């Protein structure tokens, strides 16, 4: 018979290759696969490899016109998930030829574009990706990175402080600018547009940019420190987004902001390129991430979105807090914080890292801890996130009983006290509360903040636990 045999054949015959070893240039993926009852794991794993690379549901004549073995994804290892019935980690290797250079959009379209609706699987979650050096080098990555940001801001040896301006919707541009000024004047490094502040009827973007720039320069003149406000450039079209970034550059502000998941990777990469060319820092908000990453058995883990952002480009990204109101289990959070900041990260399953990742010369991204945190959390945050981080207190600044500026003062005093205590060799984890109490003796603003928030805790079990 001729080589071509029509009909449906099992995926595992072609796409399950337990003997093969992955190449250094392959993109590797770890999927948590939950097959439908009766579907063997080898078939499910091979189905994922096939549907996310060269396969389709039946043998096609045109397969003969190419070398499938050269271009197909292959499932090279399967292991059961400990403690879960009928769940497996399937490791898939994709040849580099399958992907367009420098395109996160294409990488995701290939790897997660189609296969998640596949009928033979009850659920599917992409847990981790290993991006090979050969592919990493096709991306610009973050516009500036951690060291360049510190040099631009002239701030060293401590975490940076931020604050999201609230109420997030409804303020006029002038009142918004006033809140920005008060926070920066009180001692914060950054203030932030909320992710859904774009250009609404009650406050158009240009007015907001102007009033925020004015607030920034006034606070800079009075404090002698460089200040920033994350001007949200996210818009309905790429052209409009770039127009807003251009205006921010003309105002001479240091940083703009983008919602990278709702805005999309193509828009984000364009903005990152613009930011590097024009000396703007880029703050990234992860709005919509929980739609993708919150379910334990389906979707995509945040560490994958994290790696994608480092390729696409951003200087800051929100990372959960470990201690506030939004999720983040400590070891897992620290695992992906390292993936953001370090050049080389070893495989470590206890922190959810499935592959060793080498970022070579791609700049790092600063993790932003934000959501339900206040002065009492400061020692823990300083201890967990270290110096290369932004600690963002929205309500924890603006909720101060005396107003915004005293709220900012309280946070800055608490931070400086924690950094000093750490540098003196004290144990922040154990002595944290004592350090804050001591500092509040000579800062009435901090004392008032300690009064208001002494009892608040958001105690729920984290959804994202290690198996």
UniProtKB/Swiss-Prot annotation:
Gene: rbcL
Keywords from the named record: Calvin cycle, Carbon dioxide fixation, Chloroplast, Disulfide bond, Lyase, Magnesium, Metal-binding, Methylation, Monooxygenase, Oxidoreductase, Photorespiration, Photosynthesis, Plastid
Record-marked site positions (Transition state stabilizer): 325
Binding site for substrate: 114, 164, 168, 286, 318, 370
Chain's role: RuBisCO catalyzes two reactions: the carboxylation of D-ribulose 1,5-bisphosphate, the primary event in carbon dioxide fixation, as well as the oxidative fragmentation of the pentose substrate in the photorespiration process. Both reactions occur simultaneously and in competition at the same active site.
Cofactor: Mg(2+)
EC number(s) stated in the UniProt entry for this protein: 4.1.1.39
Enzyme class: lyase
One BP term from GO: photorespiration
Phylogenetic placement of the source organism: Eukaryota, Viridiplantae, Streptophyta, Embryophyta, Tracheophyta
Note: The basic functional RuBisCO is composed of a large chain homodimer in a 'head-to-tail' conformation. In form I RuBisCO this homodimer is arranged in a barrel-like tetramer with the small subunits forming a tetrameric 'cap' on each end of the 'barrel'.
Textual note on the cofactor: Binds 1 Mg(2+) ion per subunit.
Entry protein name: Ribulose bisphosphate carboxylase large chain
Domain of life where this protein originates: Eukaryota
UniProt PTM: The disulfide bond which can form in the large chain dimeric partners within the hexadecamer appears to be associated with oxidative stress and protein turnover.
Organism: Scutellaria bolanderi (Sierra skullcap)
Main location (coarse class): plastid
Active site: 166 (proton acceptor), 285 (proton acceptor)
Annotated positions of the N6-carboxylysine modification: 192
Self-association and partners: Heterohexadecamer of 8 large chains and 8 small chains; disulfide-linked. The disulfide link is formed within the large subunit homodimers.
């Amino acid at each position: 018979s001729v080589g071509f045999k029509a009909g449906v054949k099992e995926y595992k015959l072609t796409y399950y290759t337990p003997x093969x070893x992955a190449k250094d240039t392959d993109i590797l993926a770890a999927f948590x696969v939950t097959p439908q009852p009766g579907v063997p794991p080898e078939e499910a794993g091979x189905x994922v490899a096939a549907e996310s690379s060269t396969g389709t549901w039946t043998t096609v004549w045109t397969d003969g016109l190419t070398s499938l073995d050269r271009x197909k994804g292959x499932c090279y290892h399967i292991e059961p998930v400990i403690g879960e019935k009928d769940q497996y980690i399937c490791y898939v290797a994709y040849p580099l030829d399958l992907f367009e250079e420098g395109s996160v959009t294409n990488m995701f379209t290939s790897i997660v574009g189609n296969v998640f609706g596949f009928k033979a699987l009850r659920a599917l979650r992409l847990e981790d990706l290993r991006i090979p050096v050969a592919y990493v080098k096709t991306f610009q990555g973050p516009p500036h990175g951690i060291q360049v940001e510190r040099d631009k801001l002239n701030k060293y040896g401590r975490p940076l402080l931020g604050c999201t301006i609230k109420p997030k919707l409804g303020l006029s541009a002038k009142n918004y600018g006033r809140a920005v000024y008060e926070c920066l004047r009180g001692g914060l490094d950054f203030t932030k547009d909320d992710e859904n502040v774009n250009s609404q009827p009650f406050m158009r973007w240009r007015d907001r940019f102007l009033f925020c720039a004015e607030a920034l320069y006034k606070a800079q003149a009075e404090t002698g420190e460089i200040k920033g406000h994350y001007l949200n450039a996210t818009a309905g079209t790429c052209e409009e987004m770039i127009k807003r970034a251009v205006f921010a550059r003309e105002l001479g502000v240091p940083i703009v902001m983008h919602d990278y998941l709702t805005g999309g990777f193509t828009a984000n990469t364009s903005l990152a390129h613009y930011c590097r060319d024009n000396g703007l820092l880029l703050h990234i908000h992860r709005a919509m991430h929980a739609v993708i990453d919150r379910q334990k058995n389906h979707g995509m883990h945040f560490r994958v979105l994290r790696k994608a952002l480092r390729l696409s480009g951003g200087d800051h990204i929100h990372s959960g807090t470990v201690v506030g109101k939004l999720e983040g289990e400590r070891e897992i959070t620290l695992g992906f914080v390292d993936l953001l900041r370090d050049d080389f990260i070893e495989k470590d399953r206890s922190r959810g890292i499935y592959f060793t990742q080498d970022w070579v010369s791609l700049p790092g991204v600063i993790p932003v801890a934000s959501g339900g945190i206040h002065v009492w959390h400061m020692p823990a945050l300083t201890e967990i996130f270290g110096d290369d981080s932004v600690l963002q207190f929205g309500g924890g600044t603006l909720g101060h009983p005396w107003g915004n500026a005293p709220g900012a003062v309280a946070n800055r005093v608490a931070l400086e006290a924690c950094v000093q205590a750490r540098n003196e060799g004290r144990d922040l984890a154990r002595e944290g509360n004592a350090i804050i109490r001591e500092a509040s003796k000579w800062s009435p603003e901090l004392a008032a903040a300690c009064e208001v928030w002494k009892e608040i805790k958001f105690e729920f079990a984290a959804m994202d636990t290690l198996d």
